[in-house]
C-alpha cells in the first residue's frame, strides 16, 4: 500500500503575496490617533499655561506631551515631538519663574466658601 505519486494537492496550494508596505503604514497611522490628540492637547495646555499663567495647565501639558511621546511610532516626525516637549517644559518653567508660590488647585476656593 505504498503510493508512488505526490500526495500533496497542487490545486490547494496558496502562494504567499507580500502586502504593500505603504498601504500598511497608512492603515496603521489611521488606526491610532491618540498621539496626535495628546500632542494637540499638550499644545493647548502649554499656551494656556504661558498666556494665562495657570500652573496646572502647564503640568497637564507636560503630561500630554509625555503620553504623546510614549505612543508615537518611529515613522513620526521627531521635530514635532521635541517642540511639544520644549513648549510644555517652558510653560512649567515660566509659570514658576513668574510666581514661585506653590500650586493651588482650583477646587480649594470652592471648598472654602
From Swiss-Prot:
Q: What is this protein called?
A: Protein Asterix
Please give, as recorded in its UniProt entry, the membrane topology of this protein: Single-pass membrane protein
* GO BP: any one term: protein insertion into ER membrane
> Origin organism of this chain?
Caenorhabditis elegans
Q: Which family does it belong to?
A: Belongs to the Asterix family.
The answer, when asked if Nucleotide-binding is one of the entry's keywords, is no
An example GO CC term for this entry is: endoplasmic reticulum membrane
Q: Which UniProt keywords apply?
A: Membrane, Transmembrane, Transmembrane helix
> What is the protein's major site of localization?
membrane
Which domain of life does the protein's organism represent? Eukaryota
State if ATP-binding is listed as a keyword: no
One of the entry's Gene Ontology molecular-function terms is: protein folding chaperone
Span-the-membrane segments of this chain are 81-97
